[in-house]
Amino acid sequence: VFGVLGLLAVLASGAVGCGGRGGADGKADPSPSPSPRATTAPPSFLGVYSPEKGSTVGTGAIVTVLFTRGITHRAQVERGITVTSRPPVPVVGHWFGPRRLDLRPARFWQPGTVVTLHLRLRGVEGAAGVVGVQSKDVSFTVGRDQHSVVDAAAHTMTVYRDGAVLRVLPVTAGSPEHTTYNGVMVISEKYRVTRMNGSTVGFGGEYDIPDVPHAMRLTASGTFVHGNYWAPAWVFGSENTSHGCIGLEDVKGGGSDTPAGWFYDQSIIGDTVQVVNSPDRTVAPDNGSGGWNLDWDQWTAGSAITEDPAAPTALHGPPAGTR
């Protein structure tokens, strides 16, 4: 299955934990790649893609293709991967190493856009003697416009829906010792209940919580928005106490009428969560779908195709609280 489940297993390496710093430079650790099937010569490569076919995603969804072998002929492969949309907008690729190509427009997708990923890799040489075998189209739909802005200094998360404030929620972000990344992050996974173990993200035995409710992944290195039933109620809206995640008030087992339960039910894969006023640096562009933190010139510079992408010069994403 070459859909989002396989992709996320590769991106996250199975790690579920609050916080996590990625590699030594703050980027996500290099992602292992799925092993290719045994094939006859010449060896082949596949592209594992996200979002999934037929899915409805948020306006911040970035198309990601992970390759089962390292790509050295990047321009040839990139020309075999295009993204079209209705209504049409220019979409440009950006390489994060030899096994990952992300593609996005200059600004977030408009609600209702139908996006199609065209994989025309059959017979394309990705490296010396290594050829692609895929030829397929994958379409998904962009849903309503929801984005949230976490002000780490004010301990609030403002949820916007179609340009209007939907709700302001009190939060607890990363503690002074374990600060939360700034920048635009994208929800990539949702767990109604999951286990979070500090050893999976570099915190050793500092915590092991078997039933974290309403958890939504923001980075490959382990940043989540999730419910928190173990902190006293006064913490939310007044103090930052987490290991880098964004905590919302919840109850054990998760409750639909809690702040965390409400936000979980309102959110879909591809929604953006932007953190501002944290003392930490901006999240790396390859840590999950962090590519919105590159401006358009920086993004297009990561393409292997030298022709003018013909996209308008534009700011990436919105300033805080706007669209």
Place the predicted regions along the sequence by residue.
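Post-signal peptide N-terminal regions of Sec-secreted extracellular proteins
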Residues: 40-45, 139-141, 146, 164, ...
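Short, charged beta-turn/beta-strand-edge "cap" motif at the junction between a beta-strand
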Residues: 121-124, 163, 193, 278-282
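Short, solvent-exposed loop/turn elements at domain surfaces
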Residues: 73-76, 157-159, 194-198, 225-226
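Exported/periplasmic cell-wall-interacting domains
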Residues: 144-145, 198-323
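Acidic, low-complexity Ser/Thr/Gly/Pro-rich repeat segments typical of extracellular/periplasmic
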Residues: 4-7, 11-14, 19-144, 310-317
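Compositionally biased low-complexity segments at domain edges in trafficked proteins
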Residues: 146-172
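Short, flexible surface segments
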Residues: 59, 111, 181-182, 269
